[in-house]
């Protein structure tokens, strides 16, 4: 079974209670409409809470900026058997999706923007609550299997994500991929490490980003939100919008912000790991720039699909 594709719908919204009320009310409706398509295998929706300062490289940043930032970034992951399933779902349910998303327009500062990625590396255990832990270990014991203690990756806002942006020098993609995978394998030993994956951008969804050419642009501005623009006015296909240089997201999950800060800090402080990560740095046009996310709303069954490989 192939690894799922990931569409990440990004938007910048006002940081105020109304935004979070909309996130809680509109988000579930969007997920239910999305679930109509059989190619949909799960979701993981985040808000950004801060930025990793990386020592003093980004000295104005903090691990938690939720109280002082005027905007909040929302990053909504959806997982698909094939990226074409994502596009088909949008077209089949466009009236519902447009009206739901447009209902949040009053809070919008930037977006939506929806790149699509293939997963080229994944070490993502299933999510478990503390109540599941004894059942998992007990089942292994009863079956006579080795008692490798699984990590407890708690869902629904109880962990954090390092969302690391990278742009790679053309021709150095393989060097980057090899070095970043070795880096992540070494990070496994850090306290609080809960899993990681490397996402390679394959393009951008025009319909998911509401990019409809001139005609659709004016339709969006001129209508009250009850009349959706024609989705066939999208001017490009997903692969045509692939960025150059190549874009990657390195998604690393941690038990809490302290684990994230000291864990990611190993690429600066642990000599052997630093040497490997330096090979990553030598391939970059841009990055690493690490946003800190909190997964607030999840359909964790995508992990079950991923781990069936």
Curated annotation (Swiss-Prot):
It comes from the Archaea. Changing residue 101 to S: 1% residual enzyme activity, and no iron bound. It holds the Pfam family SOR. It catalyses: 4 sulfur + O2 + 4 H2O = 2 hydrogen sulfide + 2 sulfite + 6 H(+). It is found in: Cytoplasm. Induction: Aerobically induced. The modification Cysteine persulfide is found at residue 31. Its EC number is 1.13.11.55. Fe cation binds at residues 86, 90, 114. Homoicosatetramer. The resulting structure is a hollow sphere where catalysis takes place in the inside cavity. This is Sulfur oxygenase/reductase. The lineage of its organism: Archaea, Thermoproteota, Thermoprotei, Sulfolobales, Sulfolobaceae. The gene is sor.
